A protein has these predicted regions:
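Glycine-rich phosphate-binding loop of ATP-dependent small-molecule kinases
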Residues: 1-212
């Protein structure tokens, strides 16, 4: 895990030096089996905003806040299918990585760095702003004998807003409303601390990485 984290941190440094990461829209059109389409294009890194790209042909516009909200239920349904597939495929001893951090903190950039080295592991690339959902998924992970890791990317909120949220929106990637942004940055650290305490006895590992 420590080596995997080194790859992620290296990618964050490249972004800080100007080599930003913006998730591109796949050239392959979505197929009837959205989970297979997703895995071919994004790998085992589960991300709601990537799932929304399956609906561009249906009118999804990542730069439009109303469109982002409109297609959130559809993309959430795809994510649920992917998580079901994850639990069907992952074997005991493998790892599920839970990303955590406010919007624009650099989670997906970090994931871009570890993507080639995941092997049989999976990543849930989300903010971890929902304590209930994270708790439920962690319970399932440990129930099947897999390992769980939380990687919390920490970034100054205004830096995350200016050089994370606004910059990616300017490049045509997904936008984030300010109120959602503020909620995640206020909530995530407490959620990580709560989960760390509750699941310590089951072997949950937590890594906190500052993205400066």
């Amino acid at each position: 895990m420590r080596q995997l984290i080194k790859y992620g941190k290296k990618r964050l440094k490249k972004a800080a030096a100007g080599n930003d990461f913006f998730q591109k829209v796949p050239e392959e059109l979505p197929q009837e089996d959205l989970t297979a389409w997703y895995l071919r294009n994004f790998g085992r890194i589960i991300n709601t905003d990537c799932a929304k790209m399956a609906f561009i042909k249906d009118g999804y516009m990542p730069y439009d806040p109303e469109s982002v909200a409109k297609f959130h239920p559809d993309s959430s349904a795809v994510v649920k299918l992917l998580i079901s597939k994850m639990f069907a495929e992952i074997s005991p001893g493998k790892t599920v990585i839970f990303m955590a951090g406010g919007n624009g903190s650099g989670k997906s950039t970090f994931c871009d760095g570890i993507r080639p080295y995941l092997e049989g592991d999976w990543v849930i690339d989300a903010t971890l702003a929902s304590l209930e959902a994270a708790h439920r998924t962690l319970e399932e992970v440990f129930a099947i004998g897999a390992n769980a890791v939380i990687i919390h990317i920490i970034r100054d909120p205004e830096e995350a807003w200016e050089n994370g949220v606004l910059k990616r929106a300017a490049h045509g990637s997904h936008c984030t409303p300010r109120n959602v942004f503020e909620f995640t940055h206020k909530t995530v650290a407490d959620n990580v601390a709560t989960l760390e305490q509750e699941f310590a006895s089951k072997g949950l590992q937590v890594y906190r990485i500052e993205n400066k």
